[in-house]
C-alpha cells in the first residue's frame, strides 16, 4: 500500500509525468536488447517504420540513369542525397511501381522453369478443393514429413554436384556425376537454362528445392504426403480441421506410395519361395517403379515402412533402429532388458516357448491410426496410455500392447489351439500366434484383464472391456488420452543383418522386422511397377502367368532350344516355370509331366519329328516332378478364368493359338510374341539349332578322329573339321565356320544336309 501511495504522489507532480512520457528510452538493458546482434528484434515494426519514411530503399547509383527523377504525377522517385555510409542512392517505394509499369521488359521464358515448384504449387492450390471446417479436438502427433512437393530424391551431396555442374559449369572442383538420375537431371536442366538471365544464386536455391527431399518433424493429424503438408496451416488448427483435396499429385508422393506397394508384394512373394532372401534380392534388382530401378529408389528414399525396410536391409542399407510388432513401430525410450526362453501354458494347455524380456522398459508405439506410451516390467504391463482416431484403432493398440507385455493373464485367455501359419504354410512364432489369435477376437482377453478404479487426471479417461469410456474405472493399467504420442524424431540409422527367412536383427540380435509384420493391405500403385522377375508374374492372376510363361519361352527361344536338346533337366528346373505349376490341376501334374517328357525324348531320338510350336506349347508342363505312367493325352488342362481350359497337344486352342502365316502366338487372345524361326521347317531337327555356326560337309571322314558328341563341338577352333555324332547314332563331318555372319542360314540348310549325308 505504501508503495502505491508513493507512486500516486509522484504522478501528481507534473514534472514526473513529463519525464516519463517525453524522455528517450536510454535504459542500458533495453538499448542492449534492441541493438545487440544482427537479428532484427521486431521485424514488423521495423518494416512499418521504414516504409513510413520517404526513401526506405537503397539502390545502385546506375538507377538514376534508368528511372526519371519524378513520375507522371510529379512525385519524387529518388533523392539526390546519398545513403549514409554507402555510395548508394535512396529510393522511394514509388520507384518500384514506376519500374514495374515502365521498366525494361525481359524474357520471362525461364521463370516457370526456374520457379517450377512455385508455379506447380499455385496450380495445385487452384485446382484443389477446400471443404467445410469442423471444430473438434485434434489428436496431432509429430511425424517426420516431407515438406517439399515435387522433388527428386538426390542426397545433398549428389544435388550439390548437379547444381554446380548446371549453374557454374566452368568452376574448378571435382564433381563426379555417377547416378543415372544425376546425369538425366543435369542434361535436362542445362538445356532448359540456356541464355537464362536469372541470378545464378537464385537458380541454385530453386534447383535445391527441386532435387532434395526436405523433411521436418511436424504435428500432423491427417494426411502426411507432401501435397497435404504444404497446406498444413490451412487444414488443421488446435481445435479445428478443414477438409481439403489436393488439386494435383507430385511424383515424390507417388514414388513413396508405389515403393511401399512394390516392397510389400515382393516381401510377400519372397516369403513363400524356397530361398526367401535370394528371391527378394532378385526381385528388387529386376523391378522398376515409374521407369526407375527399384534398388536406386531404395538407396535414396527415406520412407520407413516394414516391407521397404526389409528390402533395404537385404541390400545392406542402414535402417531405423525401432522395431515393429503388430503393425506398430516400437521405440524404446528408457530402461533395458535381457532375453530368456521360457515355456508357458495357454488356457488350452498348449505349451508355448516364448522369449521373455526381463527388466523394466518404456516404449512409444506409433501406428497409422493410434499411438501409445507403454511402461512394462518382466511379463507385466504397468501402464499403457493410448490415443487413437476411433474405438477400433484404440482396441488394436491395446491388443498389441497386452500381447507384447507377455502377461500370464493374456496367455491364459487363449481359447482353442494356436495354429496360425504364414503364406509359406510355416507355423508363426509364438508371439505372432498370440497376436493373430487376439486380433481375431479379444473379448476374453479384455474380460480377464482386470479392472481398477481410477483417479481423475486431466486429459485422461478410463476404458472398459467393451471399449466404452469411463471416468470411474478402467482396465488395469490402461488409460485413453486426448493427446497423441509423437513419432520418434531421431532419424538415426543403424547397421542390421538379415537372415534367409527375411528376419532383420540389430547388432545385439534383437529382431526388428520379419515378414509377419508386413501389412496385407492391397493398394493400387500410382506409378507403373514393372516386375521383370518371373516370381511376380502371378501378381496379376493366372492369365498373366500363362501369357508371361510363353512370352519368356519365345523371347529366350535360342537358348531354350539348345538346352532342350542337350540338357533338358536343367531346363525343366528353371524357376521361370514355377508359377505355371499353380495353374495345372494338382492331381494330374505328375502324369502330364511324365507324358510330355516322354514325348520330348521321342522327338530327340527320332530325327525329323521336331516341332517347335509343340515344344513351346508343352514345355511348361514338363517342369513338374514326373510320374511314370502309360497314360496318353490329347489335351492338357490349365485352370484360368475360373475354370479348366484345354490346351490341345496337337493343334490350336483358344488358350494357345499359333498363326503359321504371321508366325504370331496368341495366348488367351493376348499377343505372346513372334517366333523368329519358322517352326514349319517342321522337321528341322534340334541338331540344326545346335549345329549353327558349323558347315556340314558330308559323311563321316575317319581322318578327323573319333566322333565327338554335340556338346564337345564348342571346343573346335574356327575352320577346324570334326566328325560329330547326331540323333540316332549317325555320324557326319562338320567344319566350324570362319565367319559368324552366315550362322543364320545354318539351321535351314543343316536339316537338308544331314539327310543327304546320312542317306
UniProtKB/Swiss-Prot annotation:
Coiled coil: none annotated. Its main location: virion. A motif (Nuclear localization signal) lies at residues 736-739. GO terms for cellular component: host cell mitochondrion; host cell nucleus; virion component. One of its GO terms (biological process) is symbiont-mediated suppression of host mRNA transcription via inhibition of RNA polymerase II activity. Plays an essential role in transcription initiation and cap-stealing mechanism, in which cellular capped pre-mRNAs are used to generate primers for viral transcription. Recognizes and binds the 7-methylguanosine-containing cap of the target pre-RNA which is subsequently cleaved after 10-13 nucleotides by the viral protein PA. Plays a role in the initiation of the viral genome replication and modulates the activity of the ribonucleoprotein (RNP) complex. HAMAP family: INV_PB2 (MF_04062). This is Polymerase basic protein 2. The gene is PB2.
Amino acid at each position: 500500500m505504501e508503495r502505491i501511495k508513493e507512486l500516486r504522489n509522484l504522478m501528481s507532480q507534473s514534472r514526473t509525468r513529463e519525464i516519463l512520457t517525453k524522455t528517450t528510452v536510454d535504459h542500458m538493458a533495453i538499448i542492449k536488447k534492441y541493438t545487440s546482434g544482427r537479428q532484427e528484434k521486431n521485424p514488423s515494426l521495423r518494416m512499418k517504420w521504414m516504409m513510413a519514411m520517404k526513401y526506405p530503399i537503397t539502390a545502385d547509383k546506375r538507377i538514376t540513369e534508368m528511372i526519371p527523377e519524378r513520375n507522371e504525377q510529379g512525385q519524387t522517385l529518388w533523392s539526390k542525397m546519398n545513403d549514409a555510409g554507402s555510395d548508394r542512392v535512396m529510393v522511394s517505394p514509388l520507384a518500384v511501381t514506376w519500374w514495374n509499369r515502365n521498366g525494361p521488359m525481359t524474357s520471362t521464358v525461364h521463370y516457370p522453369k526456374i520457379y517450377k515448384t512455385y508455379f506447380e504449387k499455385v496450380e495445385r492450390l487452384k485446382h484443389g478443393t477446400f471443404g467445410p471446417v469442423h471444430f473438434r479436438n485434434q489428436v496431432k502427433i509429430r511425424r517426420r514429413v516431407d515438406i517439399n512437393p515435387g522433388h527428386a530424391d538426390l542426397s545433398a551431396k549428389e544435388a550439390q554436384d548437379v547444381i554446380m555442374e548446371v549453374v557454374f559449369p566452368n568452376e574448378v572442383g571435382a564433381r563426379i556425376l555417377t547416378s543415372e538420375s544425376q546425369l538425366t537431371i543435369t542434361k535436362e536442366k542445362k538445356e532448359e537454362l540456356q541464355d537464362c538471365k536469372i541470378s545464378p544464386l537464385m537458380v541454385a536455391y530453386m534447383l535445391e528445392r527441386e532435387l532434395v527431399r526436405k523433411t521436418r518433424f511436424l504435428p500432423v493429424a491427417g494426411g502426411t504426403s507432401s501435397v497435404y503438408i504444404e497446406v498444413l496451416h490451412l487444414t488443421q488448427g488446435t481445435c479445428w480441421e478443414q477438409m481439403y483435396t489436393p488439386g494435383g499429385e507430385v511424383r515424390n508422393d507417388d514414388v513413396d506410395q508405389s515403393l511401399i506397394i512394390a516392397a510389400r508384394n515382393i516381401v510377400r512373394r519372397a516369403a513363400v519361395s524356397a530361398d526367401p532372401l535370394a528371391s527378394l534380392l532378385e526381385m528388387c534388382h529386376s523391378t522398376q517403379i515409374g521407369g526407375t530401378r527399384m534398388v536406386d529408389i531404395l538407396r535414396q528414399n527415406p520412407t520407413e515402412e516394414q516391407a521397404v525396410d526389409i528390402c533395404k536391409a537385404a541390400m545392406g542399407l542402414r535402417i531405423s533402429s525401432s522395431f515393429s510388432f503388430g503393425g506398430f513401430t516400437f521405440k524404446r525410450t528408457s530402461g533395458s532388458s535381457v532375453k530368456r526362453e521360457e515355456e508357458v501354458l495357454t488356457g488350452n494347455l498348449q505349451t508355448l516357448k516364448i522369449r521373455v524380456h526381463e527388466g523394466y522398459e518404456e516404449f512409444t508405439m506409433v501406428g497409422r491410426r493410434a499411438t501409445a506410451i507403454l511402461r512394462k516390467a518382466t511379463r507385466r504391463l504397468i501402464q499403457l496410455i493410448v490415443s487413437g482416431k476411433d474405438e477400433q484403432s484404440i482396441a488394436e493398440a491395446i491388443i498389441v500392447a497386452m500381447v507384447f507385455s507377455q502377461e500370464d493373464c493374456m496367455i491364459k485367455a487363449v481359447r482353442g489351439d494356436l495354429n496360425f501359419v504364414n503364406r509359406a504354410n510355416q507355423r508363426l512364432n509364438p508371439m505372432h500366434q498370440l497376436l493373430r489369435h487376439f486380433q481375431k477376437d479379444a473379448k476374453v482377453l479384455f474380460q480377464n484383464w482386470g479392472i481398477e478404479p481410477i483417479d481423475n487426471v486431466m486429459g485422461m479417461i478410463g476404458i472398459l472391456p467393451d471399449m466404452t469410456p469411463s471416468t470411474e474405472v478402467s482396465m488395469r493399467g490402461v488409460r485413453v488420452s486426448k493427446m497423441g504420442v509423437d513419432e520418434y524424431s531421431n532419424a538415426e540409422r543403424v547397421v542390421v543383418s538379415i537372415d534367409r527367412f527375411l528376419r532383420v536383427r540389430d547388432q545385439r540380435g534383437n529382431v526388428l522386422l520379419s515378414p509377419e509384420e508386413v501389412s496385407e493391405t492391397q493398394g493400387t500403385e500410382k506409378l507403373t511397377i514393372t516386375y521383370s522377375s518371373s516370381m511376380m508374374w502371378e501378381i496379376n492372376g493366372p492369365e498373366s502367368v500363362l501369357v508371361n510363361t510363353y512370352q519368356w519361352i519365345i523371347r529366350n527361344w535360342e537358348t531354350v532350344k539348345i538346352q532342350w536338346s542337350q540338357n533338358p533337366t536343367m531346363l525343366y528346373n528353371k524357376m521361370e516355370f514355377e508359377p505355371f505349376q499353380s495353374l495345372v490341376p494338382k492331381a494330374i501334374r505328375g502324369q502330364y509331366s511324365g507324358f510330355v517328357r516322354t514325348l520330348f525324348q521321342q522327338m530327340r531320338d527320332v530325327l525329323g519329328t521336331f516341332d517347335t510350336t509343340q515344344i513351346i506349347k508343352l514345355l511348361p508342363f514338363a517342369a513338374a516332378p514326373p510320374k511314370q505312367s502309360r497314360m496318353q493325352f490329347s489335351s492338357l488342362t490349365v485352370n484360368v478364368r475360373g475354370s479348366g481350359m484345354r490346351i490341345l497337344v496337337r493343334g490350336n486352342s483358344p488358350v494357345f493359338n499359333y498363326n503359321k502365316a504371321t508366325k504370331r502366338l496368341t495366348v488367351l487372345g493376348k499377343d505372346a510374341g513372334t517366333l523368329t524361326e519358322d517352326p514349319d521347317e517342321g522337321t528341322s531337327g534340334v541338331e540344326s539349332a545346335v549345329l549353327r555356326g558349323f558347315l556340314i560337309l558330308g559323311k563321316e571322314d575317319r581322318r578327323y578322329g573319333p566322333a565327338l558328341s554335340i556338346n564337345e563341338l564348342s571346343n573346335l577352333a574356327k575352320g577346324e573339321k570334326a566328325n560329330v555324332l547326331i540323333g540316332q547314332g549317325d555320324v557326319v563331318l562338320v567344319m566350324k565356320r570362319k565367319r559368324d555372319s552366315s550362322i543364320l542360314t545354318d539351321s535351314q540348310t543343316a536339316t537338308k544336309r544331314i539327310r543327304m549325308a546320312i542317306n
